[in-house]
A protein has these predicted regions:
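Extracellular and secretory-pathway beta-repeat/beta-biased strand scaffolds
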Residues: 1-384
Length: 384
């Protein structure tokens, strides 16, 4: 099926919107900034098992839910799938304000690609799950957002998605990634509920979230919820010659970096910045968050090191009640030149440094870095 659009913005109301396994829907739009808002008014969720192609941007709104099956292939300049209402007036006024209490979920098991240099992918609902592939690798301006809440605002500047604002709500919000989210040096935002009121929000990552780049510096990854559990990988590495690591923020009340967790913001010419539980400025432009409890389990890895040259980066792990360090934390200087970085492990309450913990701020051809320990009560179960 071909949908031909001649205007920059168009609204299509559907009784149902589904794409079968062998079907393809083509949106033929004037340019990459043209947008089609597809609003489903019927009582059933949208099931996308086939292909959607667009040279512009595609928005699917269905309060009953939007599911992309394992065979789904979506390729557009930008993609939004949501169960929240998006009014015609806001759409025409270029205001991306999504709100409402739709009970449906947004689930991706297929492949969604944003191919434009300023392209983005946004999955917005009370419950968002990615079990497939979300890819936006055209430019460092790309952003992928998986956000759960009752009112969500996407903030743009010069047609680029710059951040997300989630208003306070009381719903049980869940965002989960089980497969792959990939931006090439861009930004990934994974948030459940507002940073102002983190209650009832859960983020779980057992997959791989990548904001690394082979050409540019590492990008930015934000995980924000009341309860954040990472058993997978968060990677914002600068892999190319002369590049530096990016920034990774894990913000919430209760944070667990499980034994299989790997968080890395390494760079060829300098380490990046990793904040776990510490007061960090996150991408949703909301107040800084400090965790109550942070646990870094045995064999978990947190690294902001320089690889070849340059200084190690900064790793900050902080809580107000208890911080437990049992894993491996590194902010090493480059192998050829550069100094070690800074690791700060702290708590207003209790800081536990377990027997399996390792903290590395070494420099082969420079000065060693600094490991700062700050706590109301310090418990050390290892040789220092």
């Amino acid at each position: 099926m071909n949908i031909n659009q001649t205007s920059q913005r168009a609204v299509v109301n559907w009784q149902s919107f589904d794409v079968g396994a062998n079907a393809q829907v083509n949106f033929n739009q004037p340019n990459a900034q043209a947008v089609t808002l597809n609003r489903v008014t019927g009582a059933s969720a949208s099931q996308i098992d086939g292909a959607i192609r667009a040279n512009g941007q595609v928005i699917i709104v269905n309060s009953n839910g939007v599911s992309f099956g394992k065979g789904a292939q979506v390729d557009a300049a930008a993609v939004v799938a949501t169960t929240m209402n998006f009014s015609n007036q806001d759409f025409m006024d270029f205001k991306h304000v999504y709100q409402g209490n739709g009970t449906g979920k947004v689930v991706n098991e297929g492949r969604i690609t944003a191919h434009d240099p300023k392209g983005f992918i946004a999955l917005l609902a009370p419950e968002v799950r990615n079990e497939g592939y979300l890819v936006a690798r055209a430019n460092v301006a790309n952003t992928i957002a998986m956000v759960a809440g009752e009112k969500i605002t996407l903030n743009f500047q010069n047609n680029q998605l710059m951040g997300v604002r989630v208003d306070v709500s009381t719903i049980n919000a869940l965002v989960e990634n089980k497969r792959l989210v990939f931006v090439d040096g861009g930004t990934v935002i994974v948030a459940a509920n507002s940073a102002r009121q983190l209650m009832n929000g859960v983020v779980r990552n057992s997959g791989v979230i990548v904001a690394s780049s082979a050409v540019n510096n590492g990008g930015k990854i934000d995980l924000i919820a009341a309860d954040v559990t990472n058993t997978g990988k968060l990677l914002a590495n600068g892999k190319g010659t002369g590049t530096t690591g990016g920034q990774i923020n894990v913000a919430g009340e209760n944070i667990t970096l499980a034994a299989s967790s790997k968080i890395a913001a390494n760079g060829d010419a300098g380490g990046g910045q990793i904040n776990v539980g510490s007061k960090a400025a996150v991408s949703n432009n909301e107040p800084a968050i400090t965790a109550k409890n942070v646990r870094v389990e045995s064999t978990a890895v947190v690294s902001a090191s320089a690889i070849n040259s340059g200084n190690g980066g900064t790793v900050k792990i902080h809580s107000t009640e208890q911080t437990q360090i049992h894993g491996v934390i590194s902010a090493n200087g480059g192998a050829v030149s550069g100094n070690g970085g800074v690791v700060q492990t702290s708590s207003n309450g209790t800081l536990v440094v377990g027997s399996t913990s390792q903290v590395n701020v070494a420099a082969t051809n420079g000065q060693s870095g600094t490991w700062k320990l700050q706590a109301g009560q310090l418990n050390i179960d290892r040789n220092m």
